[in-house]
Amino acid sequence: MTEEHVVLLDEQDKPSGTLEKYAAHTLNTPLHLAFSCWLFNEDGQLLVTRRSLSKKAWPGVWTNSVCGHPQQDETTEEAIIRRCRFELGVEITDLTPVYPHFSYRATDPNGIVENEVCPVFAARATSVLQVNSEEVMDYQWSEFKSVWKSLLATPWAFSPWMVMQASDEQARERLLDYCQR
C-alpha cells in the first residue's frame, strides 16, 4: 500500500491540509479525520479484531472491526471499503452511518495520542475474511450483546474509541438494530 496521510482539520472540522499518517500520530497529534466501522456477518455477529503488535497506537488491544483515515479527495465510504479490503480482505455491503458526529481524544500507554473526528459506520461482510497479519493479529465473530458485556466488564482490554462508541446509547441502539436485521 502506498504511503497514507491523514486529513488535518481546523477548529470547525474543515480540512486544512494533510500529514503523513505516522508523522501525525505523536504525543501532540493534530485533529484529523478518521472513521470507525463495525462489521456484521449474515448471522448478525460482530467482527471484533485485535490490533497487531506492530501498530503505533494501542498495539495488541481488541477493537471494533476496522478503523482508518480517508485520504485527500476520498470519501469516508470509499476509505472504509479500501481498508476493509486491505486489513481484512473482505468485501462489504449496506454501509450505514450509526454515529456520524463521533469525535474523541485519547492517549495510549506509550503516550501516543489519537485526536480524531471519527464518523462511525456499520456494514455487512459479504465474503470470507483474509486477514492481513500486519494489521490484525486475531479476530472473533461474537454476538453484539456479549461484546457489550465484555466492554462493560473489561474496558481496558479494548480500544478507547470502541468503548466510547458503544457507550453512546443512541449509537449502541443503532448497532443493535443493524445486527438484528
Curated annotation (Swiss-Prot):
Cofactor binding description: Binds 1 Mg(2+) ion per subunit. The magnesium ion binds only when substrate is bound.
For this UniProt entry, the molecular function terms from Gene Ontology, in alphabetical order, are: isopentenyl-diphosphate delta-isomerase activity; metal ion binding
Would the keyword Isomerase turn up in this protein's UniProt record?
Answer: yes
Classification of source organism:
Bacteria, Pseudomonadati, Pseudomonadota, Gammaproteobacteria, Enterobacterales
Q: What is this protein called?
A: Isopentenyl-diphosphate Delta-isomerase
Q: Where is the active site?
A: C67, E116
Q: Which Gene Ontology cellular-component terms appear in the entry?
A: cytoplasm
Please verify whether the record's keywords include Metal-binding.
Answer: yes
Where's the Nudix hydrolase domain? Answer: 30-164
Known cofactor(s): Mg(2+); Mn(2+)
**Family annotation (CDD domains):** NUDIX_IPP_Isomerase
Organism of provenance: Salmonella paratyphi B (strain ATCC BAA-1250 / SPB7)
Places the protein is found: Cytoplasm
Give the main location.
cytoplasm
Homology family: Belongs to the IPP isomerase type 1 family.
Q: In which pathway does it act?
A: Isoprenoid biosynthesis; dimethylallyl diphosphate biosynthesis; dimethylallyl diphosphate from isopentenyl diphosphate: step 1/1
The record ties this protein, via PROSITE patterns, to: NUDIX
* Single GO biological process annotation from the record: dimethylallyl diphosphate biosynthetic process
Q: What does this protein do?
A: Catalyzes the 1,3-allylic rearrangement of the homoallylic substrate isopentenyl (IPP) to its highly electrophilic allylic isomer, dimethylallyl diphosphate (DMAPP).
What residues bind Mn(2+), as annotated? H25, H32, H69, E114, E116
Q: Which gene encodes it?
A: idi
Q: Which UniProt keywords apply?
A: Cytoplasm, Isomerase, Isoprene biosynthesis, Magnesium, Manganese, Metal-binding
Q: What is catalyzed by this enzyme?
A: isopentenyl diphosphate = dimethylallyl diphosphate
